């Protein structure tokens, strides 16, 4: 991810796709109930690492960008990325999370079974272990959380990007947009909470790239 930032910001390519799975958006800096910063099957938050590197002063080994926007679309809210970049307001970052939500998004029948890591989360009292339905509110202007219905669809994500994300991104005027794509939103994922096809991921990425052309000369890292 850091190498991708170098390539995009350095002008070697207009945008870049990093073959990383997962982006790590549940890994944060705050300890959760299991006394670790890793959670939700994520150990290293590559997206947050790339954003921090991009904005680090040149004298400290970074690239010195003023503003980076992270757009996260996934079944779950990216609690770790928000925790690292935006636990308090930081004018360098805008974090956008588009995720499943609503009262009908209640998880699996065994969601409170602490021994079943596949079931934990969603609307569970143990959601600190797997974040599930958190992220319905935005704590400050550096965060835009957009909970959708119970199933993530291309139509809903696309509409959110055009109607809610685009004005916010244009106002923020980032130097770089980083996409955090959650592939568990694929319609064939065994959890069954996503409705996206491979083509949908491509279309959503194209819409995000168009936002980048309008705001930061097309510089996108996914």
What are the residue ranges of the model-derived segments?
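A short helix->loop->beta-strand "cap" motif at the edges of active sites that frequently abuts
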Residues: 214-220
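Conserved alpha-helical scaffold segments that buttress catalytic/binding sites
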Residues: 6, 17-214
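Short, well-ordered coil/turn segments that N-cap beta-strands
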Residues: 13-14, 218
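Fold-level signal for large, globular catalytic cores of enzyme and receptor domains
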Residues: 2-13
């Amino acid at each position: 991810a850091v190498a991708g930032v170098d390539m995009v910001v350095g002008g070697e390519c207009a945008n870049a796709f990093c073959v990383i799975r997962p982006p790590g958006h549940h890994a944060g800096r705050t300890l959760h109930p299991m006394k670790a910063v890793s959670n939700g099957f994520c150990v290293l938050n590559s997206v947050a690492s790339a954003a921090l590197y991009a904005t680090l002063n040149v004298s400290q080994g970074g690239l010195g960008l003023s503003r980076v926007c992270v757009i996260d679309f996934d079944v779950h809210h990216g609690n770790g990325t928000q925790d690292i970049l935006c636990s308090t307001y930081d004018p360098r970052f805008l974090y956008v999370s588009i995720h499943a939500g609503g009262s009908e998004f209640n998880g699996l029948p065994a969601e409170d079974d602490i021994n079943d890591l596949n079931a934990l989360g969603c609307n569970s009292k143990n959601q600190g272990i797997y974040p599930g339905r958190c992220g319905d509110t935005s704590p400050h202007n550096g965060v835009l959380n957009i909970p959708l219905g119970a199933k993530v669809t291309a139509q809903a994500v696309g509409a959110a990007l055009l109607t809610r994300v685009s004005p916010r991104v244009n106002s923020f005027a980032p130097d770089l947009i980083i996409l955090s794509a959650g592939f568990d939103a694929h319609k064939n994922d065994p959890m069954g909470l996503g409705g996206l096809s491979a083509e949908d991921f491509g279309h959503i990425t194209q819409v995000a790239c168009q936002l980048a052309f309008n705001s930061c000369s097309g510089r996108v890292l996914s």
